[in-house]
């Protein structure tokens, strides 16, 4: 079993995945809205490079108020046409991702940029959305809780802290807790490229402290200050920004 996160339509990276490692677990964010390194993504295709570069700078400055106003301005003309272009691009990206993964056994949870409705429409038969469920694999109990942390951006895949907490409570005791976003620890949630604290779950940190799983696996923060952290007896691991690094975490490396 191998784990990846933040594919963000990285088709070249997907083509490098080994096919002899067992099931593939995807911890969210299959499509690419904006790549904050170079501006590539759906937003650039629809609104143009200049606008996206400005949006990136506003995010780096943490100016969500101006960013929100800019989004409103961008949609002020030809709104329906732009929304349709975005919708079409989302469908296309999911279809291309799932086409490459057709020969894998895939378990996934949604991330903050994912459109759950379109994901469900486009996923192939070999793909299981395991959000909110427990999986027993090789005598290891995995718990899965997807969704993005709520932010001023209000992305498609965001859920409330209370909704996420409820998911965790229903999972109960697990050996490995798998989420999209990390527990709320400064070193795990601070991105050195966007120059800000990204999102993290307070309830996940509490879950780890009380339930004491052996591992916490996640993604979401692309370039964190720390990729690994210890909370009590639990080792927390960011499995990597797959679009950029093509990296994956092999279950065997955890030596459970």
Regions found by a protein language model. Give the residues of each.
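Binuclear metal-dependent phosphoesterase catalytic core
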Residues: 134-139, 156, 206-210, 224-256
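Histidine-centered catalytic micro-motifs
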Residues: 6-7, 178-183, 213-224
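Short acidic, glycine-rich surface-loop motifs adjacent to enzyme active sites
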Residues: 31, 40, 171-190
């Amino acid at each position: 079993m191998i784990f990846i996160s933040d594919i963000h339509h990285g088709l070249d990276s997907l083509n490098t995945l080994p096919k002899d490692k067992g099931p593939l677990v995807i911890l969210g964010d299959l499509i690419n809205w904006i790549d904050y390194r170079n501006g590539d993504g759906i937003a650039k295709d629809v609104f143009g490079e200049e606008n996206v570069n400005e949006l990136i700078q506003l995010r780096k400055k943490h100016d969500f108020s101006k960013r929100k106003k800019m989004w409103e301005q961008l949609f002020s003309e030809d709104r329906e046409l732009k929304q349709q272009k975005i919708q079409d691009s989302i469908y296309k990206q999911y279809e291309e991702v799932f086409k490459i993964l057709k020969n894998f056994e895939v378990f996934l949870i949604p991330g903050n940029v994912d459109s759950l409705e379109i994901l469900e429409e486009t996923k192939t038969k070999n793909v299981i959305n395991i959000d909110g469920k427990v999986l027993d694999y090789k005598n290891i109990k995995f718990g899965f809780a997807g969704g993005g942390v709520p932010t001023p951006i209000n992305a498609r895949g965001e859920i409330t802290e209370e909704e996420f907490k409820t998911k965790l409570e229903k999972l109960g005791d697990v050996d490995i807790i798998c989420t999209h976003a990390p527990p709320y620890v400064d070193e795990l949630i601070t991105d050195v490229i966007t120059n800000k604290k990204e999102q993290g779950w307070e309830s996940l940190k509490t879950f780890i402290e009380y339930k004491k799983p052996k591992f916490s696996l996640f993604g979401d923060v692309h370039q964190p200050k720390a990729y690994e952290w210890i909370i009590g007896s639990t080792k927390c691991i960011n499995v990597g920004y797959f679009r950029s690094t093509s990296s994956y975490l092999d279950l065997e490396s955890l030596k459970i």
